[in-house]
């Protein structure tokens, strides 16, 4: 009877950054590389030991105006494997990039412990992970085989 507790990848990335000293009003912006200049991202703010969701998970094409309104108001810390490609485009003084942030198992465990135990084992049999976009598997084509 070990429960399966779902934990959001972007929140795990945030938890990996929280050990550093951040300003109280800073927003955390984890980014997963989607393709070209697209990332999967959300905005979070630390409130005590909890993460407060400022904007929901979304797919975003990064351009010079991305996050412009938010950056005009407060500092935003960008990290994750999608942040590096955004560094040359998002140049606002309130934009801070944190290198080498990867999901850590210890952070996943901490987030799982903080999550309310609202999902019981029966419900977990029907649990489906959240994917922002539908996965479409293309048939593989091996050269020389038909």
Regions found by a protein language model. Give the residues of each.
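Acyltransferase
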Residues: 98-146
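Surface "functional belts" at beta-alpha junctions
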Residues: 2-103, 131, 136-137, 141
């Amino acid at each position: 009877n070990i429960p399966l507790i779902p934990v959001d990848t972007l929140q795990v990335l945030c938890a990996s950054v929280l050990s550093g000293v951040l300003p109280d009003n800073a927003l955390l912006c984890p980014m997963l590389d989607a393709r070209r200049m697209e990332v999967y991202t959300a905005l979070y703010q630390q409130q005590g030991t909890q993460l407060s969701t400022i904007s929901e998970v979304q797919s975003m094409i990064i351009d010079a105006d991305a996050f412009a309104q938010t950056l005009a108001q407060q500092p935003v810390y960008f990290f994750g494997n999608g942040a590096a490609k955004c560094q040359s485009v998002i140049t606002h003084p309130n934009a801070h990039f944190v290198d080498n942030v990867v999901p850590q198992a210890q952070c996943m465990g901490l987030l799982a412990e903080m999550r309310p135990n609202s999902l019981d084992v029966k419900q977990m049999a029907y649990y489906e992970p959240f994917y922002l976009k539908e996965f479409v598997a293309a048939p593989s084509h091996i050269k020389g085989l038909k």
